[in-house]
Amino acid sequence: EIPLRLVGSEMCIRDRKYIMINEFYKDMTGKGSVIRQFFDYANKKGAEIGMENIYNFSIGNPSVPVPQTFTDRMIELLQTEDPVKLHSYSPSLGLPSTRQAVADSLNKRFGMNYTMDHIFMTSAAASALAHALRCVTKDGDEVITFAPYFPEYVPYVTGTGAKLTVIPADITTFQINFEEFEKSLNPNVQAILINSPNNPSGIVYSTATITKLADILRAKEKEYGHPIYLISDEPYREIVFAGVDAPFISKLYENTICCYSFSKSVSLPGERIGYMAVNPACEDAKLLVLMAGQISRFTGHNCPPSIIQMAVESVLDQTSDLSIYETNKNILYKELTRIGYEMVEPGGTFYMFPRALTEDANEFCWRAAKELNLIIVPGDSFLCPGHFRISYCVTTDMVEKAIPLFEKLYKLYR
């Protein structure tokens, strides 16, 4: 039986009617995303002077088309499939054929032994993360993540009743700051949340980094007497540059829950399609997937559309042409370091994270926007002040035209 109670509400009189509102979410409405502020400024300014005069590096929206295979499969499904089946409800865990296809793809590519019972289809990585966290945490538990990190981790974790602890960044490498991490471990820690390749730094955690992390977690599991889950946020898994060591994290630690999205790898952010894959060696692996289906009853999540699940089966072993991202990275890294900017070279994604030229990165980014129409976002949002993020999922032409603006920005401070 599900207990019912009223939490965090107040009674208001408005037009002589009693209205119940939730104070927690009401307070959130006044805390808008800084990234969104810059994005909105770019659109407003672009409406005045023309978007071609705005150099918008604020948002991580893929700039390359979906593989033709996906488009062809969508057309084929619409032309040949029974429309009733095509537009019917999906089972709560996802279509069996899609879940099995995902498992087969992971097994083939990474030498794993997933079955469909280890796969839960989701509305991209955000939904996968929210479900994974609810599977393994409760009120009073603790989740650890590492700066710089995706700001939405805060509501994902606090929505479970758990506490999010953020380990300060090692800004010399942006690999895991193990000294601070080990100080923060305690019996309340139920999960570690990582993102590699990383938004916003573009850094990829090496095999050595993940192996060391796994060894520490195994030792602490024995000490504390309970599993510590590694929740791996992997929407950029396929965007890794030449020669970069990029391990499949689930291969290196048993209690790993992989949260994946097709938004970046095959340019499907609007379709909201991804999955949660529980390592078969994970404690209660199959049970966690069944639990995710029950959690959906509380979150209102009811699987991605059936047609999108069917179509994505055709691109499980494909990507969009991602080469433009490495081209853009190479140009920006070469030119910005020539100018004098300091940064750790990205190993993947379509982000880089240079040091700002003043400690107040927020002021630095607003000056770039208002004086140069150059839209970049401050690192404070990622709990890494003194840095700024460049999202280079744009045309190479825009990257090349923006270099003189980055040089002008540098000269404003040096």
Q: What are these regions, as identified by a protein language model?
A:
Residues 1-15:
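Single conserved hydrophobic/aromatic residue that forms the stacking wall/gate
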Residues 85-225, 237-252, 399:
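Conserved core of the PLP fold type I
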Residues 254-326, 330-334, 410:
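Conserved core segment of the aminotransferase class I/II
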Residues 11-12, 57, 196-199:
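Flexible low-complexity scaffold tracts in large eukaryotic assembly proteins
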Residues 16-18, 104, 108, 182, ...:
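PLP-dependent enzyme catalytic core of the Aspartate aminotransferase-like
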Residues 299-305, 316-321, 330-357, 378-383, ...:
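Conserved small-domain helix->loop->beta segment predominantly found in fold-type I
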Residues 65, 325-330, 339-371, 388, ...:
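Conserved PLP-binding catalytic core of the aspartate aminotransferase-like
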Residues 21, 26-124, 131, 315-319, ...:
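N-terminal small-domain helix-loop-helix segment of the aminotransferase-like
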